[in-house]
Amino acid sequence: MKNDLETCAEEYSALLDQACMNVGADLFEDQIEIFVLAMAKARFSAAKSLANHSGADHQDLAKYFLASTLRELDRLLLADPTVYGLSQPEISGKEAINEPLKPENVTKIGKQYASAPLPDIHLASEHEIIRKTFSDFSDKHIKPVAQKIHNENLLVPKSLIEPLKDLGTFGLSIPEKFGGLKPDDREDLITMVIVTEELSAGSLGAAGSLITRPEIIARALLEGGTEQQKNKWLGKIASGETLCAVSVTEANAGSDVASVSLSASKTEGGYILNGSKLWCTFAGAANVILVLARTDKTEKSHKGLSLFMVEKPSSESDEFEFSQDSGGRMTGKAIKTLGYRGMHSFEMSYTDFFVPEENLIGGDTGLNRGFYYTMKGFLNGRLQTAARACGLMRSAYESTRAFATDRSIFNKKLVDHPLTLRKIADMAGLISASRTYTLDVAKKMEQGGGALDANLVKLFACQSAERVARDALQLHGGMGYAQEPEVSRHFVDAKVLSIFEGTEETLAVRVVGREMTVN
C-alpha cells in the first residue's frame, strides 16, 4: 500500500510529464524551460531509483531525498504553472513532503551517516568480487600518488598503467573473442560501472578516466568496424598494448559535434587530414587516436563525417611533433588545466597528414557514417561518466566525514553541528541516488534500452558531484582551499564532469530536450 509521500510523488511525476508535453519544441527559443525540465526529470528519476532500492535501514534517507526533490519540483513547476502550460493543481497529501524535511529528522539522518556506511548497492557476488579487487587496487596504488600527480601535473605513471593492464581494465567493453573481458553473448555494463567508480574514487584524472577512451573506441569499432579492423585493433586495445585517445572537439565545434570541420580529403591509398582539434585527452601517450573528420564538404551537418584510426608514436612530453616521409605533420601541445590532471589534454594540429584507407572505420561502408559511430560510443561514455562522478563524490564525502569527526570548533566536534549534519545528509542522498540510478541505467542498457536515461543520469550525477565537492571543501574551511588536502583536487576535478561528454546545457536541451518534447 502506498504511503502519502509516494502518492504525492506520483502526482508530481504526472505534472512533470505534462509540463514536458506542453513546453515548446523550439530548442533555441524554449531552451530555458527545456533545461529546467530536463534537470528536474533527471533528479526525479534518481530519487525514484533510490526509493526503489533502499532497505529498511535507509528508508529515512530515501524519504528525505524524495521529499527534497518534490519540494524543488513544486518550486519549479507551481510558482508560475502557466510557464509550463499547467493549471494550479491540487496535490493530494502535499503535507507529506514536510515531515522528512523537518530539522530534527534531517539531523537524525546526518548522525546516521556520520558514523555508518552509505547504503549498499546490492551487487551480485561476482560483481562484488570485482568491486573489491579494484577498490583494493585504488587504495594501495592510486590514492598514495593521486595528489602528487595533481599538484605537479604529472603524466599517469607506468607503475599504474602496467598493473591495470594485467587486471584487464582496458578490455572491459571488448568481447572475449577479441581478447577482452566482456562476454561474447551479452553486455556487461555493470562491471564497467563499478570498475570506473572504484578507479575514480582513487583519482578521476589519473585512473577513473583511463578506460573511457578504450570504451568509446571499442563501441565505435564494434558498431561500424570491418572484421579486419576489429581483429587488428580490439585485442591490442584490450591488452593495453595500444593506448588510445579520442579526438572530436574543435575550437568552433565543442558539444556541437555535427559542426566538425577538420577535413579528410581522398587521395591515392587513403586520406589527407588538415585542421586542428582541442581537448584530445591522453593524445601524447596514445599510440592511436580516433579522429572524427569531414569527408564530404558538401554536407555541412553530421552526414558528412567519418572516423579514422590515426596511428602515432607514443610520447611522454607536453609537446610533440610527428612528421611523415610524405611531408605530413601532426603536432600536439598540452593544455594547462585547473584539474583533471594525469592524462593531459592536447591541442592537436594536422597538416597534410596521411591516413591509409584501411584505417577508415567501416571502410567504404563507413564513409560519412562517423557521427553515428561516435554517438554510439558517447552513449556508453555518458553512463561511464556518471560512474566517474559517483567515485569522485564518494571519495570527497568519505574524506570529509573523517575530517568532520576529528575537527573541533566552538568546543564541539564539527560533525556534531546541525548544519554539518545537514550537509552530510544531503551528500549521502546525492551520492546514493547517483549510484543506484547509474546501476539501474546500466541494467536497462544491457537489455538494449536506457538511451534517454544514460543522458539523464549523466546530468544528475555530474551536477551532484559538483554539489558534493563544494560542500566537502566548505566543511574543510580554510584547509580545503589549500593544495595539500585531496578535497581541493575533488573540487576542481568535479567541475569538468558537467563539461565533457556533452556539456550540461547541450545535453539537457539538445539531447534530453529533443526526446522529451517529441515524446
For each of these PLM feature ranges, what is it?
Residues 175-176, 209-211, 248, 275-277:
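Glycine-rich, histidine-containing beta strand-loop boundary motifs that form or position
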Residues 201-205, 222-230, 239, 243:
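Alpha-helix capping at helix-to-loop junctions
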Residues 206-214, 241-250, 450:
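Core alpha/beta catalytic barrel or barrel-like domain that forms the active/cofactor pocket
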Residues 207-228, 254:
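N-terminal glycine-rich flavin-associated loop
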Residues 1-8, 17, 118-123, 186, ...:
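FAD-binding core of flavoproteins
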Residues 216, 220, 232-233, 294, ...:
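Short, hydrophobic/aromatic alpha-helical segments in well-folded domains
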Residues 1-201, 212, 224, 240, ...:
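Alpha-helical interface subdomain recognition
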